């Protein structure tokens, strides 16, 4: 399993880091088989798995439950778990309780937190307690209400400078990596050059140290539309619907199950059971 040291070395050597979300045993197992470097159990599970309109309703219990499943499916992959909405915008003591629960109960190797400001002290606090932290700047889904929706961040010089400052503060506080979401590629490149920790981009262009996408977006599974920054590498959704539709049709017309899908009794047992009457 790759570690923080490996990711730092990959950045130094210019080897891109691959990260993918996973939310359950099968998706994690497939991600590991595909040799993904890092798995993110994102609070995006609220939208793509649980059917919520945002990540806000996701709880600490949800994150623990799904991370445990992911750990069972990807035992040799570094796993990062999101701290959900309002689980770390509380007192440092309560933040530690939530963080401890997620790490101890789920087996996550690191936690991800969104934003800067007071979150910088949270990163420092958790790091000092021995919990690796991944920071997340740019578009932070838990704060879309404050940001005015899902919009690109850092498009003007002033806000870009603020993001650069925040990125440096995240590193100084002890973050082991930084996710940059929906920021101009020029800004992402500049931030990546000024940090020693890896930057993982999602809608941040090529000049970052790694990329992350949502599992369901990448394979077109249960999603009707995807953001501009997503490339869909396959469409399992069409195959799944086709397969289920065929199953429904064959059951309705009694084509399924066939004899080869059924079990039989020996003739003498049939006679003993109901006098040999067979349907």
Swiss-Prot record:
Molecular functions per Gene Ontology: 3-methyl-2-oxobutanoate hydroxymethyltransferase activity; magnesium ion binding
Reaction(s) this enzyme catalyzes, per UniProt: 3-methyl-2-oxobutanoate + (6R)-5,10-methylene-5,6,7,8-tetrahydrofolate + H2O = 2-dehydropantoate + (6S)-5,6,7,8-tetrahydrofolate
E.C. number: 2.1.2.11
Gene Ontology CC: one annotated term: cytoplasm
Position of the signal peptide: none
EC main group: transferase
Keywords recorded for this protein, A-Z: Cytoplasm, Magnesium, Metal-binding, Pantothenate biosynthesis, Transferase
Coiled-coil regions listed: none
Residues at which 3-methyl-2-oxobutanoate binds: 43-44, 82, 112
Annotated catalytic residues: 181
Residue sites binding Mg(2+) per the record: 43, 82, 114
GO BP terms in the entry: pantothenate biosynthetic process
Names of required cofactors: Mg(2+)
Compartment(s) of residence: Cytoplasm
Cofactor details (free text): Binds 1 Mg(2+) ion per subunit.
InterPro entries in the record: Pantoate_hydroxy_MeTrfase, Pyrv/PenolPyrv_kinase-like_dom, Pyrv_kinase-like_dom_sf
DNA-binding in keyword set: no
Pathway: Cofactor biosynthesis; (R)-pantothenate biosynthesis; (R)-pantoate from 3-methyl-2-oxobutanoate: step 1/2
Function field: Catalyzes the reversible reaction in which hydroxymethyl group from 5,10-methylenetetrahydrofolate is transferred onto alpha-ketoisovalerate to form ketopantoate.
Family: Belongs to the PanB family.
HAMAP family per the UniProt record, alphabetical: PanB
Subunit structure, interactors included: Homodecamer; pentamer of dimers.
Protein name: 3-methyl-2-oxobutanoate hydroxymethyltransferase
Organism this protein belongs to: Bacillus anthracis
The gene coding this protein: panB
